[in-house]
Amino acid sequence: MRPAQASIDLEALRHNYRLAKRLGGSKALAVVKADAYGHGAVPCAQALEPEADGFAVACIEEALELRQAGIRAPILLLEGFFEHDELRLIAEHDLWTVAATPQQVRALAAFQSPRPLRVWLKMDSGMHRLGLSPEDFRAAWLRLRGLPQIASLVLMTHLARADELDCSRTDEQAVAFALTAGGMRAETSLRNSPGLLGWPALRNDWSRPGLMLYGANPFPQDTENTAQLRPVMTLRSRIILVRDLPVGEPVGYGARFVAERPTRVGVVAMGYADGYPQFAPNGTPVLVDGQVCPLIGRVSMDMLTVDLTDHPQADIGATVQLWGQAPRVGPLATQCNVSAYQLLCGLKRLPRTYVGSAAVGEVAAR
């Protein structure tokens, strides 16, 4: 079997969820969209369900996958519904839905639901993606609040620049949301991962932690709060070949690395098709049997190469750790000019092993 794999620590996942609850002082929906940011939505939801207040996903397909796996906790559709027919599935499977467009509000007002629906009404406070204008937001609340098919309303918005701790935009959004939602008797939801980790003055009834659940830092630098996060995913493989190169010999496509000294090269079974960033620069650190070694040469589809010259004990079969407790995925993403979100969600073909939960079992694969 090819040795590349992702190990998922479910106890670290639970720790990060508890941290989100503690920082928020509120209920929290665990965001498990995009296959739990590449960690496996079903195993992660199963591990969190005994203590989670609920879950959030992007769309109904992701919600139904959780329901079919036996998840009974509340599940919120963050993008709401795309077709009117989905409303019957939402009611049938006891899902919660966001209403973020005038079309969704009209559809909810006209829907004869077999059971009252819990709706999260979304205001655009400055993200300018999904969300109702302040005027439409107030009108939608007035229109929906007394309808028999609406069980309750939660008022929400989404922070656009909370990962920039010196940016005033977050406070401006919070004020705009408070001014519009003031006087509306309903629970509120404002804080995402950076909002929880970096903006303690913000308050809401429901938080929506996503990236932080998986132990990744949304900020360029560590803070007192982000230092408490535990990485959930460890990306590992092994050395599959070792060769010695003389001075002047290149490594990999495009000869991006040329040996300036006699160089001992280790070939690792891990490439960009596995989700490792293709444009990771020379010198990017990896751990080989616990010792830091630099990446050399361009990352290929299925392989990458590291400099073992200063680690003479390393040989074929040595364990290579690409990210996890060290190196962390956040600094790696910054070094490669991508986001941690993109790296974590990009692991499409790797098998995953799970530790830290008797409910799920020790090993599960994609």
Swiss-Prot record:
Its EC number is 5.1.1.1. Its cofactor is pyridoxal 5'-phosphate. This is Alanine racemase. The modification N6-(pyridoxal phosphate)lysine is found at residue 33. Belongs to the alanine racemase family. Catalyzes the interconversion of L-alanine and D-alanine. May also act on other amino acids. It comes from the Bacteria. The keyword Isomerase applies. The active site is at residues 33, 253. NCBIfam families: alr (TIGR00492). Keywords: Isomerase, Pyridoxal phosphate. Pathway: Amino-acid biosynthesis; D-alanine biosynthesis; D-alanine from L-alanine: step 1/1. GO terms for biological process: D-alanine biosynthetic process.
